[in-house]
Curated annotation (Swiss-Prot):
GO MF terms, alphabetically ordered: 4-hydroxy-tetrahydrodipicolinate reductase; NAD binding; NADP binding; oxidoreductase activity, acting on CH or CH2 groups, NAD or NADP as acceptor
Enzyme category, top tier: oxidoreductase
Keyword NAD attached: yes
Protein name per its UniProtKB record: 4-hydroxy-tetrahydrodipicolinate reductase
E.C. number(s) listed in UniProt: 1.17.1.8
Transmembrane segments: none
A cellular component term, taken from the record's GO annotations: cytosol
UniProt pathway: Amino-acid biosynthesis; L-lysine biosynthesis via DAP pathway; (S)-tetrahydrodipicolinate from L-aspartate: step 4/4
Name of the gene encoding the protein in the UniProt record: dapB
Annotated residues for binding of (S)-2,3,4,5-tetrahydrodipicolinate: 154, 163-164
Role played: Catalyzes the conversion of 4-hydroxy-tetrahydrodipicolinate (HTPA) to tetrahydrodipicolinate.
Keywords annotated in UniProt: Amino-acid biosynthesis, Cytoplasm, Diaminopimelate biosynthesis, Lysine biosynthesis, NAD, NADP, Oxidoreductase
SUPFAM superfamilies: Glyceraldehyde-3-phosphate dehydrogenase-like, C-terminal domain, NAD(P)-binding Rossmann-fold domains
Residues annotated for NAD(+) binding in this entry: 10-15, 97-99, 123-126
């Protein structure tokens, strides 16, 4: 199998570095370029010490120079949207792990995939355990009508609620087919989190955390808690590799890693 050539956008960030390290360990993937707004030199040393790859803040230049099969994006929505447009114009498939997009931006990303005849996967979470957590929450939502979501992340995460929390809530509501039980009236506005059709969502941002979420269901005499904890960014890499592998054979827009797992 010819290795899949990959450019990483947001390469100097923590997720970008983890992606590059993982790609270097795999025979079927080949990192060929790195892009980051903080780039100050024309080359970036690979994490495994095997050499260096072209490095620039100019995405279009890197894509023209390296001719990748896939661009992996882990940045912020404000930086990601212009990069997605550029990559799509270059006919480069995309794996997007950035969150915080508006519904209008997601619609634009879907249209870019169609217009440019490329594959784009946008996934709020690449941890396989987190995907299974959402799936189990969907199952429970068919039977239990009171639920709350608590998501906890590191203090550098900009968006709240997290993309995973929003996807979890949407999936639960879809599975249930109606609103959950409305919680009692609160005396202090937003003291019990943000309400989504009866589901309260609570966001915690603290140093020392990475990415954690629990979905708590309650019924008379019982509770059910479904929880996922990410302690290291390594947990996202199997999902990222799966997305890269599949997107080169996929046309159009895919939202969520669960579609590739066929859950």
């Amino acid at each position: 199998m010819t290795p899949i050539k990959v450019v990483v956008h947001g390469a100097s960030g923590k997720m970008g570095q983890e992606v590059l390290k993982t790609l270097c360990q795999e025979n079927n993937f080949h990192p060929v370029g790195a892009v980051d707004i903080r780039a100050e030199s024309p080359a970036m040393a690979l994490p495994d010490g095997s050499g260096s790859i072209p490095y620039s803040a100019d995405l279009s230049s890197i894509l023209s120079q390296t001719k990748p099969d896939v661009m992996v994006d882990f940045t912020v929505a404000k930086a990601s949207m212009p990069a997605i447009r550029i990559a799509a114009a270059h006919k480069v498939n995309l794996v997007i792990g950035t969150t915080g997009f508006s519904p209008e931006e997601i619609s634009e990303i879907e249209q870019l995939a169609k217009t440019n005849d490329i594959g784009i996967i946008l996934a709020p979470n690449f941890a396989l355990g987190a995907i299974i957590m959402v799936h189990l929450a969907q199952v429970a939502s068919r039977f239990l009508s009171s639920a709350e979501v608590i998501e906890l992340h590191h203090d550098k995460k900009l968006d709240s609620p997290s993309g995973t929390a929003l996807v979890t809530v949407a999936s639960m509501l879809e599975a249930r087919g109606e609103a959950f039980n409305k919680p009692p009236k609160e005396n202090l506005t937003d003291a019990r989190g943000q309400e989504h059709d009866g589901i309260r969502v609570h966001s915690v941002r603290l140093p020392g955390l990475l990415a954690h979420q629990e979905v708590i269901f309650g019924a008379a005499g019982q509770t059910l808690t479904i929880r996922h904890d990410a302690f290291s960014r390594e947990c996202y890499m199997p999902g990222v590799l799966l997305a890269i592998k599949e997107i080169v054979h996929t046309k159009g827009f895919v939202f969520g890693l669960d579609k590739l797992l066929k859950l």
